[in-house]
Regions:
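Short, flexible, glycine/charge-rich loop motifs used to bind or transfer phosphoryl groups or to couple energy/partner
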Residues: 24, 43-45, 71-72
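Conserved acidic carboxylate
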Residues: 7
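Non-catalytic signal-transmission and effector/linker regions of two-component phosphorelay proteins
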Residues: 1-2
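CheY-like receiver
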Residues: 51-92
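Acidic, metal-coordinating helix/loop segments flanking the phosphotransfer/catalytic sites
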Residues: 35-53
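Alpha-helical elements of the RecA-like P-loop NTPase motor core of helicases
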Residues: 14, 44, 92
Length: 92
């Protein structure tokens, strides 16, 4: 499974990657995880390199996670997008 993670906070990015690696190991799965600290970089890469699932921070500079998801949806309508944030304004 190819997974893209995008978060401008490197500590959070590494934490998510580590949790996914632990999960993959526990389940006997193989994950290819690519990390991005720039939403613009992921937007330009994802059009040519498809991922099975996207984990996106909501609040990022230049392009937020919501607009990044819109960019991704323009060429990938089916891969799941999971939004992540530590901001209480988006809490459910």
């Amino acid at each position: 499974m190819k997974i893209a993670i995008c978060d401008d906070n490197e500590a959070e990015l590494n934490r998510i990657r580590e949790l996914l690696e632990i999960y993959a190991c526990d389940k006997g799965q193989k994950f290819f995880i690519k990390c991005f600290t720039s939403s613009v970089e992921l937007a330009s890469t994802a059009e040519f390199e498809k991922y099975d699932i996207y984990f996106l921070d909501i609040i990022m500079p230049v392009m937020d996670g919501i607009n990044l998801a819109r960019e991704i949806r323009a060429f990938d309508r089916f891969s799941p997008v999971i939004f992540l944030t530590s901001s209480p304004e988006f809490a459910v």
